[in-house]
């Protein structure tokens, strides 16, 4: 997006994008342990944002790694109990209770699940060397 502020910290209707994601998981299962993985350099900033925007969702914060794989691995290491694990990109705040319910039910039934949302094709008008997006 080209912002100086990382996407997960942008405000969406008075709350950070990451906070909105956390709130959906907490509402789905208040006993769930949420683990937030962030670059080490962003952890204190996140804690400040939690205080400023009243992010009261209980969660554990761990340092990420060099690559996404390393960050997921660090998050997995922070898990203290056995159970089904959901890995969610916190900059995707439009996760719904239904998505979580379907994902967890499928994982319980088959051992794993990968939720997805169908992509929407865009309509473009090409005029010589340029193109523009058309309203649907």
Region roles according to the model:
Residues 1-43:
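N-terminal glycine-rich phosphate-binding loop and ensuing alpha1 helix
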Residues 9, 18, 75, 88-89, ...:
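Residue-level signal for inorganic ion chemistry
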Residues 31-35, 58-59, 111:
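Short active-site oxyanion
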Residues 36, 87, 112-115:
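Structural beta-sheet core signal
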Residues 44-49:
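Acidic helix N-cap motif at the loop->helix transition within catalytic regions
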Residues 51-84:
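Short phosphate-binding loop-to-helix
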Residues 95-136:
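Conserved core of the sugar-phosphate nucleotidyltransferase
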């Amino acid at each position: 997006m080209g912002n100086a502020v990382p996407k997960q910290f942008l405000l969406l209707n008075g709350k950070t994008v990451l906070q909105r994601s956390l709130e959906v998981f907490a509402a789905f299962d208040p006993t769930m342990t949420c683990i937030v993985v962030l670059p080490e350099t962003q952890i204190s900033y996140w804690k400040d944002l939690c205080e400023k925007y009243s992010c009261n969702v209980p969660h554990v914060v761990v340092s990420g790694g060099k690559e996404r794989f390393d960050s997921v691995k660090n998050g997995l290491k922070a898990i203290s109990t056995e159970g089904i694990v959901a890995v969610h990109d916190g900059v995707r705040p439009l996760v719904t209770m239904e998505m979580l319910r379907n994902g967890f039910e499928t994982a319980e039934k088959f051992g794993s699940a990968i939720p997805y949302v169908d992509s929407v094709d865009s309509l473009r008008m090409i005029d010589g060397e340029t193109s523009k997006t058309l309203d649907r």
